[in-house]
């Protein structure tokens, strides 16, 4: 098992702007307000798809932005809500906010969903601001900005495919040429003492996880060599790729090797024999390989399909990877037996962005700088092209206590105050 990690950016769509509009009707002031609300922006949602096994797709697409809601229209017509952006992830994906380190979601079951970036609500049209004192308001809200955050997706990956065979038959070499894994390769036995895993991406767009497992020897089911450690890992795979050395340079007979390995698998756990097994005749670039392959085929019979390859020259490797991907499409899942690998009662954590109180700082140029989630949200939703909207924003700041706080910090009439990239004069 290894942990696959990828960083992605998600932003919910902004809400549509509310509209300032009036209907043309006799005896109604200014025709009466008739501006509709904007539509809600699209949220970015992660959804579990049990057909996915890796985070490979996120290597090429790391930015996810929801669409904006439609703007409000005249005649009290509201803008259309944007359709949520649903992003598929494999089971077992954990989602963390990169900035805060907070766990946002732990996605485990097919169809489970988590909203990771909410779409902004639509701005209200001028019909929403009617009062007895102001029956025809010339004010509407801009749409609320959608949430945005950088996320860390983590997936604990179990191998789909296990490479088995005696030591030094070429398992590590094969894994190194079909994936980005860098296993230790040397001309002595048991170079691999822990599983190496790599993600294989086939030419037709399919992907799977392959494990180069420690070499198996006789007596492994009784714990000889790395037996128990090896067999615990092979128990988790869905397809077994049995690699046999056709060169016979180690002094072993390919036919005997094949039967000995299968005997160890059957002795350890009868369920290992239920897994689909692809037989690979490796080291076909060596002098004696063709003669040994002929004898090997005769011993196994026509019903056993054998894939001749050379991990060194890469001959036959592409066809082998496609055959493995085909086999995986029909191979069933096998449950894990180790309690340490099972996670019970996983919880979907709902993350709510806390409302920050505003803060006041002084910039290097001496300008008072205002920041804070609630204040910046109100600022972004204000249409500063309309005088009534500007006055409303000023009243809201006073209600929040911003004016009083600026005075306590020494602000005087005419001093500059900056919100985001915009500057205003402080007026007593």
UniProtKB/Swiss-Prot annotation:
Residues 159-329 form the OBG-type G domain. It is an enzyme of class 3 (hydrolase). Residues 350-428 form the OCT domain. It is found in: Cytoplasm. Monomer. An essential GTPase which binds GTP, GDP and possibly (p)ppGpp with moderate affinity, with high nucleotide exchange rates and a fairly low GTP hydrolysis rate. Plays a role in control of the cell cycle, stress response, ribosome biogenesis and in those bacteria that undergo differentiation, in morphogenesis control. Belongs to the TRAFAC class OBG-HflX-like GTPase superfamily. OBG GTPase family. This is GTPase Obg. It comes from Shouchella clausii (strain KSM-K16). The lineage of its organism: Bacteria, Bacillati, Bacillota, Bacilli, Bacillales. The gene is obg.
């Amino acid at each position: 098992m290894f942990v696959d990690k990828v960083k992605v950016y998600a932003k919910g769509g902004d809400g549509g702007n509310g509209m300032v509009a009036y209907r043309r009707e006799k005896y109604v002031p200014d025709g009466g307000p008739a501006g509709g609300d904007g539509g809600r922006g699209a949220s970015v949602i992660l959804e579990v798809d049990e057909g996915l096994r890796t985070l490979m797709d996120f290597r090429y697409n790391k930015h996810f932005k929801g669409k904006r809601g439609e703007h409000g229209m005249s005649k009290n017509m509201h803008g259309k809500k944007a359709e949520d952006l649903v992003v598929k992830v494999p089971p077992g994906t954990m989602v963390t906010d990169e900035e805060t380190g907070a766990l946002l979601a732990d996605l485990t079951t097919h169809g489970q969903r988590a909203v990771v970036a909410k779409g902004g609500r639509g701005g209200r049209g001028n019909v929403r601001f009617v009062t007895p004192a102001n029956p025809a308001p010339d004010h509407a809200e801009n749409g609320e900005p959608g949430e945005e955050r950088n996320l860390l997706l983590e997936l604990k990956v179990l191998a789909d495919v296990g490479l088995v065979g005696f030591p030094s038959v070429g398992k590590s070499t094969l894994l190194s040429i079909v994936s980005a894994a860098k296993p230790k390769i040397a001309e002595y036995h048991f170079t691999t003492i822990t599983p190496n895993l790599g993600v294989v991406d086939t030419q037709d767009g399919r992907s799977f996880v392959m494990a180069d497992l420690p070499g198996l020897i006789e007596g492994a089911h009784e714990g000889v060599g790395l037996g128990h450690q090896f067999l615990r890992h092979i128990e988790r795979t869905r397809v077994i790729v049995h690699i046999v050395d056709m060169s016979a340079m180690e002094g072993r007979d390919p036919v005997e090797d094949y039967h000995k390995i299968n005997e160890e698998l059957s002795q350890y756990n009868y369920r290992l024999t239920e897994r689909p097994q692809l037989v690979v005749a490796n080291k076909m670039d060596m002098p004696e390989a063709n003669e040994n392959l002929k004898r090997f085929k005769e011993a196994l019979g026509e019903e056993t399909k054998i894939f001749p390859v050379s991990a060194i020259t890469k001959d036959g490797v592409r066809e082998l990877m496609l055959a493995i991907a085909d086999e995986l499409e029909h191979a069933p899942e096998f449950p894990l037996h180790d309690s340490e690998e099972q996670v019970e009662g996983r919880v979907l954590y709902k993350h709510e962005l806390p409302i920050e109180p505003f803060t006041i700082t002084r910039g290097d140029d001496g300008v008072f700088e205002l920041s804070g989630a609630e204040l910046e949200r109100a600022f972004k939703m204000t249409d500063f092209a309309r005088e009534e909207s500007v006055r409303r924003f000023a009243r809201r700041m006073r209600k929040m206590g911003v004016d009083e706080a600026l005075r306590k910090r020494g602000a005087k009439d005419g001093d500059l105050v900056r919100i985001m990239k915009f500057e205003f004069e402080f007026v007593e």
